[in-house]
Amino acid sequence: MKRTYQPSKTKRVRRFGFRALMKTKGGRAVLSRRRAKGRRKLSASDEKKPF
């Protein structure tokens, strides 16, 4: 039986990247919660950037 998680950077960024989250009301809510909490990574797009 195949495992359920088959990682792909492209799919991850397209689904959970910053621009994808900004498109929906719920996604913007996610970003605002993560900002309020003080997360260094707001979305999957932030994983590419060195800090």
UniProtKB/Swiss-Prot annotation:
Family: Belongs to the bacterial ribosomal protein bL34 family.
Compositionally biased tracts (Basic residues): 31-42
Keyword terms of this UniProt record: Ribonucleoprotein, Ribosomal protein
Source organism of the structure: Treponema denticola (strain ATCC 35405 / DSM 14222 / CIP 103919 / JCM 8153 / KCTC 15104)
Region described as Disordered: spans on this chain: 25-51
The encoding gene: rpmH
PANTHER family per the UniProt record, alphabetical: LARGE RIBOSOMAL SUBUNIT PROTEIN BL34M, MITOCHONDRIAL RIBOSOMAL PROTEIN 34 FAMILY MEMBER
Protein name, as recorded: Large ribosomal subunit protein bL34
Signal peptide extent: none
GO MF annotation terms: structural constituent of ribosome
